[in-house]
A protein has these predicted regions:
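Loop/turn segments within WD40 beta-propeller blades
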Residues: 15-20, 65-71, 110-116, 135, ...
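WD40/WD-repeat beta-propeller blade N-cap
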Residues: 4-10, 55-61, 99-106, 142-148, ...
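A structural motif specific to WD40 beta-propellers
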Residues: 50-52, 94-97, 137-140, 179-182, ...
Length: 304
């Protein structure tokens, strides 16, 4: 296992979709409650993680997403409701642009790989927004009844997005018709959601530690329930390589590796000593995973 130790707490980590040895991570001072943020770009080898570029911000950074067009572009979302675009190939420490798209904290941001000029963001203002990065214009706005924690573009349907919320629902929206398609309702807050790239499935992670997976073609009754966390599930991600593999991270400080055909995790990794906030699969190596935590660390490891 490779580990990088920061002086700030880890919030989100993402592998580059273009460069097989590049990963980004955002860290925050004082657990993101007050203080500054850092966007760190790393290169890595089989033996070490190397800091390549670092940007410091006055506000906490809660999530990041690499561009699906330009290999050296990455976008970040802030505690003050701003979105910043960075080019980590140059020596300039200023963003290419900074736009205020939300009135409160932005918790999640994603770049569409099907329509690569679009980004999706959500936040504490209860809003979900589609922004055109070419001009900064908001194209669509959707809402929940409470804080929106997580949002995603559908991997194959360019007009479909998802969002999960403190209001105990996960909603699907059509950005062409500007209408809600479906709502999955729960008795618990839904902190995270992710689409499966190969099957018509969506996974939801709940505040009670449960993960449920739904078939988008069928009813609102879950088809799979995964039990393996003792506290809130902070993030789930399906593997980009197959339909059965999932990783999840939690406030219980564990990283769980699942085959969704089984109700319990195949492996439980407990290398973190604080809440685990971020995780990702490499797009170039099906066994390579990254995690980041409030224990100030970014970790890379091979699941084999």
């Amino acid at each position: 296992m490779l580990k990088y130790k920061s002086d700030f707490q880890g919030y989100s980590c993402k592998f580059s979709p273009f460069l097989d040895n590049i990963i980004g991570c955002c860290f925050n001072q004082y657990y993101g409650i007050i203080g500054n943020g850092k966007l760190s770009i790393f290169s890595f080898t089989e033996s070490e993680i190397l800091l390549k570029k670092e940007y410091k911000t006055n506000e906490a950074i809660f999530d990041i997403s690499f561009s699906e067009i330009y290999k050296n572009y990455i976008i970040s979302c802030q505690g003050d409701g701003t979105i910043k675009l960075w080019d980590f190939s140059n020596n300039n420490n200023l963003p290419l642009f900074s736009i205020k798209q939300h009135e409160k904290e932005i918790w999640n941001i994603n770049w569409s790989h099907l329509i690569p000029n679009l980004i999706l963001s959500c936040g504490s203002d209860k809003l979900l927004k589609i922004t055109d990065v070419q001009n900064g214009k908001v194209l669509n706005t959707f809402n929940h009844n409470d804080i929106i924690y997580s949002c995603n573009f559908h991997p194959t349907l360019s007009n479909v997005i998802s969002s999960s919320s403190k209001d105990k629902s996960c909603k699907l929206f059509d950005i062409k018709s500007n209408k809600e398609i479906k709502s999955f309702n729960s008795n618990y807050e839904i902190l995270t959601c992710d689409f499966n790239r190969y099957d018509n499935l969506i996974g939801l992670g709940y505040s009670n530690g449960i993960i449920q997976i739904y078939d988008l073609r069928k009813s609102d009754i879950e088809v799979i329930t995964l039990n393996g966390h003792n506290l809130c599930v902070k993030k789930i991600i399906f593997s980009p390589f197959d339909s059965k593999t999932l990783i999840s991270v939690s406030y219980d400080m564990n990283v769980n590796y699942w085959n969704i055909s089984y109700s319990i995790p195949i492996h439980i990794f407990n290398h973190h000593k604080e809440f685990v906030y971020g995780c990702d699969f490499s797009l170039f190596n099906k066994n390579l995973i990254s995690t980041t935590s409030w224990d100030n660390s970014l970790c890379l490891f091979n699941i084999n």
